[in-house]
């Protein structure tokens, strides 16, 4: 049966010997035996030359990056390129599927969630333990543990090792895309968060906004105080040799509006020989835009690069201006819809639990980051389940003057804390929303607006759009001391 009661789940590990033989006196009834073990994911890194190919390391334990770094980049940083000759390290696309276990998983889960994992393992394999709601809460704790290990033990440790050699670190998106995890938090360790965009633009697959959305990476950079947002730029499966600079400029403009400030061309290939027929050799046979010195439009590259350089220079000056801070919720595990309908004339950034709890405060009625980026409102969009600590932080922000838009959650998002967590949850929900189901609930210096759409709430608060325009104009607003400027394109 798919449903099973927690008190019916027995741990019979002690009945199995070292050779894997089970010697168990089976009680009355019908039993299903789950034999649980773990193996290497079986993935190798790629694409890579034969000499640089090997097994993927453990991403949920520091032993993985320790061995990987010492055996690869560390050999250069502490060898032929020591003394500052190597100044950076880039971790490219994930491309190694996912990992769900490490030897210390049970200890790590208890440390993170506060209760033992083993009896709940059937839920990982698709069983409903007790009921749907209880199982959903456990699975959130499970995914949060994996996400935290993924961020701290791999990316955090890899950056720590790189910094010991004076290397700046940039890496691309993976959390929330391949691995279910908080897609902002793991960027907090990056010196330069990185995303990617493809050409040509399209409504589906690789050229669409939602294939590899820019907004999560740009938001992570802003939330964690990183001024530069790099992008693997102009990647393509269509090696048709008919791309041109005007088309590439449009692709760049669209993604710059979403927050990209630094371009890493995909690809520029080394073409030292002069006896090849033009335009020369590309990267493989079918990926990337061929930036080559024998391209027909290469003579115009100086002007094109000057345009890109000027734009990206300005896009890193000052601070971004957005009205709405969109809280992605305590159940965040996948990438959001970048095409989600949003009020015209307003801009937003995403916010995650870690930033909400540890990096946000209120100043002059605005929600602010330590770097001074300001937001007029914080939006809770469809947050069905929440954590008590999240609600308590929201309450503290509202009392200091923050404006929160959104309805009360329907339930608790975790099994951690049990009755204590439920009491904290109930108290915070009552303090924030009280008996108000629609309208404004004033608390201290701030308020909670509920029972209406974001459009209606912004109107209720008498907030005017930053930009009023017709047609297909795209824009971005930045501000520095004494000046505002807008990047506008169509």
Model-derived regions, located:
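Mature N-terminal, pre-catalytic/accessory segment of carbohydrate-active enzymes
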Residues: 1-86
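Carbohydrate-binding surfaces of carbohydrate-active enzymes
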Residues: 75, 79-88, 93-490
């Amino acid at each position: 049966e798919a449903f099973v009661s927690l008190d019916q789940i027995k741990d019979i590990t002690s009945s199995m010997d070292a050779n894997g033989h089970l010697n168990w006196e089976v009680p009355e009834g019908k039993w299903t035996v789950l034999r649980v073990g773990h193996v290497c994911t079986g993935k190798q890194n790629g694409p890579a030359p034969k000499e640089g190919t090997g097994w993927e390391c453990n991403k949920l334990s520091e032993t993985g990056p320790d061995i990987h770094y010492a055996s690869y980049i560390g050999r250069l940083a502490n060898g032929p390129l020591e003394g500052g000759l190597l100044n950076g390290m880039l971790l490219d696309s994930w491309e190694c599927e996912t990992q769900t276990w490490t030897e210390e998983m049970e200890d790590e889960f208890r440390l993170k969630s506060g209760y033992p994992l083993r009896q709940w393992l059937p839920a990982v394999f698709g069983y409903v333990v007790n009921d749907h709601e209880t199982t959903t809460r456990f699975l959130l704790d499970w995914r949060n543990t994996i996400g935290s290990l993924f961020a701290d033990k791999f990316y955090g440790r890899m950056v720590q090792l790189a910094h010991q050699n004076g290397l700046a670190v940039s890496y691309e998106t993976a959390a929330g895309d391949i691995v279910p995890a908080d897609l902002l938090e793991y960027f907090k360790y990056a010196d330069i968060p990185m995303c990617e965009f493809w050409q040509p633009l399209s409504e589906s697959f690789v050229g669409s906004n939602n294939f590899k959305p820019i907004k999560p990476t740009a938001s992570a950079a802003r939330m964690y105080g990183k001024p530069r947002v790099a992008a693997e730029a102009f990647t393509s499966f269509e090696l048709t040799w008919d791309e041109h600079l005007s088309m590439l400029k449009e692709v760049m403009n669209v993604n710059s509006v979403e927050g990209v400030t630094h371009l890493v061309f995909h690809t520029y290939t080394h073409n030292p020989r002069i006896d090849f027929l033009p335009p020369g050799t590309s990267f493989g046979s079918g990926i990337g835009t061929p930036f080559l010195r024998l391209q027909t439009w290469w003579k115009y590259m100086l002007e094109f690069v000057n345009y890109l350089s000027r734009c990206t220079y300005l896009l890193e000056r000052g601070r971004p201006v957005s009205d709405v801070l969109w809280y992605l919720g305590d159940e965040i595990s996948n990438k959001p819809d970048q095409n989600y309908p949003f009020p015209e004339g307003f801009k937003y950034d995403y916010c995650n639990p870690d930033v909400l709890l540890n990096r946000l405060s209120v100043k002059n009625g605005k929600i602010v980051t330590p770097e001074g980026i300001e937001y007029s409102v914080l939006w809770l969009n469809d947050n069905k389940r929440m954590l008590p600590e999240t609600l308590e932080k929201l309450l503290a922000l509202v009392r200091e003057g923050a404006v929160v838009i959104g309805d009360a959650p329907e339930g608790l998002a975790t099994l951690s804390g049990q009755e204590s967590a439920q009491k904290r949850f109930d108290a915070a929900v009552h303090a924030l929303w009280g008996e108000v189901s629609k309208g404004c609930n004033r608390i201290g210096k701030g308020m909670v607006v509920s029972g209406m759409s974001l459009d209606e709430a912004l109107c209720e608060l008498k907030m005017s759009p930053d930009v009023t325009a017709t047609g297909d104009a795209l824009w971005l607003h930045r501000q520095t001391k004494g000046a505002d400027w807008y990047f506008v394109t169509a």
